[in-house]
Amino acid sequence: RDLDFSSAFALSALPHYQHLVREIGATKMQSYLDNADYGNRSMGGGVDQFWIAGNLRITPRQQLEFLRRLHRSELPFRDTVMGQVRQIMQRTERGGNVFGKTGWAISAEGLHTGWSIGWLARDRKEPLYFATLLQTTEPGDSFLDIRLLLSLEALDQVESQH
């Protein structure tokens, strides 16, 4: 079905992203990765697979730095585009001041990797950035929700100490 970018983001609609990167093309996509200094910048594995089953790798620390740069509009993209991405990332948790994305991948060996990245916007304070990474071979029923819940619990603990 046809989705706008906001809906595709919320649903992690892989076919939408694959169509988008095919439209962008490999050369331009590689330029985006290079200019944004995103992870190891590798597109090995194909233009519509490099971030799924290909060679692109990014550490939690690299993700945090990327989020900081997005939040501060320091990425090499138009300010309007970065603003739209931030708006799409805004979640309803905690009064709508959490911005983030979750993901889940399963390796060929059956390892489930779940993550939650983002930031908590705070009045007149520097945001709290977070990256939560979980791995298991037996994810259970709660794996979908636990990625963000653990992040929010950790943020609550940090907030209570400040």
Place the predicted regions along the sequence by residue.
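Short, histidine-centered active-site or binding-site loop motifs used for metal coordination
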Residues: 12, 47, 134-136
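Short helix- or helix-capping micro-motifs
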Residues: 5-12
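Active-site SXXK
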Residues: 8, 63, 130
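Catalytic-loop motifs flanking and including active-site residues across diverse enzymes
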Residues: 13-16, 59-62, 113, 147
